[in-house]
C-alpha cells in the first residue's frame, strides 16, 4: 500500500495516499482518512483529556487515527477496530511505529460491541451511525460518542432516508442543522433507554458536514425516564416562522396563534439541553495544554456553546430580516435589545446568523425591524 505520513496534534501516523484531483479525495485511498475531520478528532482528544475513561473503543478505526491520537496524547487504554483487513494492517503499522500498547482488532463492530464492554465507545462511521447504536449502547460503560455525516437525511433534505434511519420526521427548516443534531440525539436516546439507562449530553455540536454527540450514560430506570421526558417535537408553522415545543411520545394538534395554520410536528427529537457547562468549562481550561491544529476554532466553539440558550430551535437572523424587508443590523444589537426587554437571548453555534431567544416571535420581529 502506498502511504504518506501525516501529523495531527502530537501524533504522526501513516495514511493511504489519496488522489487530490478528485471531488472527494478521502474516498480514493485504499484506507479511508478524512483530513477535514481533524477538528472532530481534536475535540475528542481534548474532552477525553478531561474525562479520562478507563478504556476507549474506536469502533470504526480505518487508519486508526482517532484511536492512535487518544492512546498517544491522552494515554488511556485503546482498542481500534475495523472490518477492512487493509485498514487493520495500517492501524497496526501505526501502533508499532508510535511504540504504543494498543489493541487492534479485525471484525464487525456490532459483533465486537455485542461481546465486550468499554468505558467509552466512539462511533465514527462513513455516513449513518444508526446500525451501530444499539450494540454501542450495550457496550458503553460510561460514555458514548457518536458522529453522523449523513446530514441531508438528518436535516430533512432527504426526508424518506431520515425517516427510515432515525424513525423521525425531520423538516428542512431555516434551523435545519439543529433539527439534525436533535434528531440524532433523540434517536440515540431512544436506543439507550431500552436498557434502563439514561443519557446526559456533555458536548454536542453541528459543524460543516457532520453532527457530533459526546454523551454520559447513567444506569437505572429513573435515569432512563428523565431522558425519555426530553423526547418531543418542535411544532413548526408552515406559513410563518412561529414554532412551539411539545414533549411526549406523540404530538398533539396545535394551531399557529399568528396565522391559524396547523403546526407541523418535527420529530421525535431531543428537546433538552445539549451541553454540560461544567464539562465545557473544564475543556476550556485544558485547551492550552492540548496540541490541536484546530484549537482556535474549538475555543470559539466552546465559548459560543457555553452562552447558547437551551431552547430546542433557533432563528436565522437574516431570514427574519428578509421576511420583514429590512436590512439586518448587528446581531449583537438585537440580542442586547431583547435582554433589555427582559428576555433571554444568545447567539447559537450553528451559524453566524443563528439566534436563540425565549421572546415571542412578534417581539423578536419588532426588535429586528428596529421598532
From Swiss-Prot:
Keyword tRNA-binding: yes
GO molecular function: tRNA (guanine(26)-N2)-dimethyltransferase activity; tRNA binding
EC number: 2.1.1.216
GO biological process: tRNA N2-guanine methylation
Chain sites annotated for binding Zn(2+): 237, 240, 256, 259
Binding-site positions, S-adenosyl-L-methionine: 41, 66, 82, 108-109
Domain Trm1 methyltransferase: 4-368
Catalytic activity: guanosine(26) in tRNA + 2 S-adenosyl-L-methionine = N(2)-dimethylguanosine(26) in tRNA + 2 S-adenosyl-L-homocysteine + 2 H(+)
Pfam families: TRM
Enzyme class (EC, first level): transferase
Cystine pairs: none
Keywords: Metal-binding, Methyltransferase, RNA-binding, S-adenosyl-L-methionine, Transferase, tRNA processing, tRNA-binding, Zinc
PROSITE patterns hit by this protein: SAM_MT_TRM1 (PS51626)
Free-text function comment from the UniProt entry: Dimethylates a single guanine residue at position 26 of a number of tRNAs using S-adenosyl-L-methionine as donor of the methyl groups.
Family stated for the protein in its record: Belongs to the class I-like SAM-binding methyltransferase superfamily. Trm1 family.
NCBIfam families named among the record's database cross-references: TRM1
Protein name: tRNA (guanine(26)-N(2))-dimethyltransferase
Originating organism: Methanoculleus marisnigri (strain ATCC 35101 / DSM 1498 / JR1)
Gene symbol of the encoding locus: trm1
